[in-house]
Swiss-Prot record:
Keyword annotations: Amino-acid biosynthesis, ATP-binding, Cytoplasm, Kinase, Nucleotide-binding, Proline biosynthesis, Transferase
Primary gene name: proB
Compartments it resides in: Cytoplasm
Organism from which the protein derives: Corynebacterium efficiens (strain DSM 44549 / YS-314 / AJ 12310 / JCM 11189 / NBRC 100395)
Name assigned to this protein: Glutamate 5-kinase
Pathway note: Amino-acid biosynthesis; L-proline biosynthesis; L-glutamate 5-semialdehyde from L-glutamate: step 1/2
GO biological process: L-proline biosynthetic process
Reaction(s) catalysed (UniProt annotation): L-glutamate + ATP = L-glutamyl 5-phosphate + ADP
Length: 369
């Protein structure tokens, strides 16, 4: 798997805030650190790979110009810092890549962009066109307009979504840790985990929260790595200090193996990125049919419709006790669906005998482990 990452044609590389900012408080973008990273990225591109960068650091980069000594927690102040810092951040990326004659392009995304299929496709096309033009895409979350509860939460998840959007062959997550440990690596008894093949390899792992500068702790990186693996993308998690060997031969850090039964592009998007418009609750029989996979959802197994939605929108699918078991694209609006609940297909009018959610447009969480 490490060889597969080392030779991947299209690579998404995510760099955390702490890997881009100075040691003195982490409040300014460090040109030397960015140059070191770009040197390694250039070497990988010279070896024949396409590289897409997911860069954190806009809020951290805006702290010093605004006279802030601690990362803002107030939403409006965070957005102001991001607005100021993104300019500084892109300036440094541009200067560093210019040493090799490579232009950069800024791509700012929100969770709403990924949540709407047409907007996600537009983002994909933009990134693809930048690559065709020889431009290095620098992707970041648009913190200036993102709102609490409607955002990616951290750029680790954003990197996983971008990996899916661009059909990446590998994702490299860079931070300030050498890889995954079963507890705080400062603990001398901490055990390094070299390979993660499934959820069993993560049993007993304690992942902490984010640090002073960034928002993505180890828990978010593990979550993002597993998210990417569900779309068939192998992931390497390591320190930015190891970026050279990470991109050259991948013999460092922790590797997350991709799932063999990778989700289709639509099902991955529906489960992990799409906006949802409402909910439908199922009885036990329908729940078992959905979670076993391959079955369409029929009206007879639905017990409740929650919220207002239109035909063609994505809804959350709940089990009998309200647990979320999947998502799907509904063929009927909520008003039409209500009187259909519990009815067998043959009891419905001819124009209402389609499945409520066809199996091709139904994705469940049962196989995420």
């Amino acid at each position: 798997m490490r060889e597969r990452i080392a030779t991947a044609k299209r690579v998404v590389v995510k760099i955390g805030s702490s890997s881009l900012t100075s040691d003195e408080g982490g409040h300014t973008v460090d040109p030397n650190r960015i140059n070191t990273i770009v040197n390694a990225l250039q070497a990988r591109m010279e070896a024949g790979s396409d590289v897409i960068v997911v860069s954190s650091g806009s809020v951290a980069a805006g702290m010093a110009p605004l006279g802030l000594t601690t990362r803002p927690t107030d939403l409006s102040m965070k957005q102001a810092a991001a607005a100021v810092g993104q300019v500084h951040l892109m300036h440094q990326w541009g200067r560093s890549f210019a040493r090799y004659g490579r232009p950069v392009g800024q791509v700012l995304l929100t969770a709403g962009d990924a949540g709407q299929r047409d907007r996600a496709r537009n983002a994909q096309r933009t990134i693809d066109r930048l690559r065709m033009l020889g431009v290095i895409p620098i992707v970041n979350e648009n913190d200036t307009v993102a709102t609490t509860g409607v955002n990616f939460g951290d750029n680790d998840r954003l990197a996983a979504i971008v990996s899916h959007l661009v059909s990446a062959d590998a994702l490299v997550l860079l931070s300030d840790v050498d890889g995954l440990f079963d507890k705080n690596p400062a603990d001398p008894t901490a055990r390094f985990i070299s390979e993660v093949r499934d959820g069993n390899d993560l049993k007993g792992v304690l992942a902490g929260d984010g640090g002073k500068v960034g928002t993505g702790g180890m828990a978010s990186k593990v979550s993002a790595a597993r998210l990417a693996s569900r779309s068939g993308v192998p992931v390497l998690l390591t320190s930015a200090a190891n970026i050279g060997p990470a991109l050259e031969h991948a013999q460092v850090g922790t590797v997350f193996h991709p799932k063999e039964n990778r989700l289709s592009a639509w099902k991955f998007w529906a489960l992990y990125a799409a906006d949802t418009a409402g909910k439908i609750r199922l009885d036990q029989g329908a729940t078992e049919a959905v979670t076993s996979g391959g079955k369409s959802l029929l009206a007879v197994g639905i017990t409740e419709v929650i919220g207002d939605f239109r035909a063609g929108e994505i809804v959350e699918i709940l089990g009998p006790n309200g647990e979320i078991i999947g998502r799907g694209e509904v063929n009927y609006d909520s008003e039409t669906l209500m009187p259909m609940l519990g009815m067998k297909t043959q009891e419905l009018p001819d124009d209402m005998q389609r499945p409520v959610v066809h199996a091709d447009y139904l994705s469940n969480y049962a196989s995420r482990a």
